[in-house]
Amino acid sequence: MDVRGPEAPGGRALRDAAENLFQELQEHFQALTATLNLRMEEMGNRIEDLQKNVKDLMVQAGIENSIKEQMLKT
């Protein structure tokens, strides 16, 4: 026996609509999360590439050793 009593008119339709909305929101949230994770990974890779390029430029300019020496002095 169902202790909740009789269902209100339109209650099932409202519940179904709410469940559908929740499912849709969950799918959008998962897609957004995946997109953000991908973009963060891409940004991390770009930062690593930038750091490598800056280091290479410093070596080419001959200033890498002088910066290391200054850091050791302080």
From Swiss-Prot:
GO biological process, one term: cellular heat acclimation
Lineage: Eukaryota, Metazoa, Chordata, Craniata, Vertebrata
Pfam families found in the cross-reference section: HSBP1 (PF06825)
GO molecular function: transcription corepressor activity
Name of protein: Heat shock factor-binding protein 1-like protein 1
UniProt keyword annotations, A-Z: Coiled coil
Coiled coil spans: 12-65
GO cellular component: cytosol; nucleus
InterPro entries named in the record: HS1-bd
